[in-house]
């Protein structure tokens, strides 16, 4: 499907319920798209929808059409020193791609995944792992 879309990058997303959406704080990246699911903007620790179950959230999976594209746009992010809380995020090079007119597709076909990208995620995982060991 990526070849058919002829995209320079892709950010697969999920919509609907996920347990981490129950808390008020936003821990993950959200995508704003046009009517053809092309990325307009990606923003970390944010939801473009008040009802977060309607937003397109990234589970942390990213596609670049080749290594040169990855290197170029990650370098642009670093050169601009665009950080959040002093950290660089793998999602943010896509904004530079969009600004350059590159096509970034945002399919919403992620049905099942485990999200362990933050220390809080890891603590939840360890908690539930220990709970299930007891049975």
Protein language model features and the residues they cover:
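Conserved beta-loop-beta/alpha segment of the NTase-like Rossmann-fold superfamily
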Residues: 1-30, 35
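Catalytic-core segments of class I nucleotidyltransferases/pyrophosphorylases
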Residues: 38-113, 120-123, 127-134
């Amino acid at each position: 499907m990526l070849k058919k879309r002829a995209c320079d990058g892709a950010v697969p997303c999920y919509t609907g319920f996920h347990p981490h959406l129950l808390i008020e704080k936003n821990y993950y990246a959200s995508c704003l798209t046009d009517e053809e699911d092309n990325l307009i903007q990606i923003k970390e620790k944010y939801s473009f929808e008040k009802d977060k179950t309607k937003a397109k959230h990234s589970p942390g999976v990213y596609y670049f059409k080749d290594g040169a594209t990855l290197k170029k746009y990650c370098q642009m992010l670093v050169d601009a020193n665009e950080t959040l809380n002093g950290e660089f995020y793998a999602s943010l090079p896509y904004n530079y791609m969009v600004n350059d007119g590159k096509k970034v597709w945002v399919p919403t076909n992620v049905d099942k995944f485990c999200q362990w990208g933050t220390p809080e995620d890891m603590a939840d995982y360890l908690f539930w792992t220990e709970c299930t060991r007891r049975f």
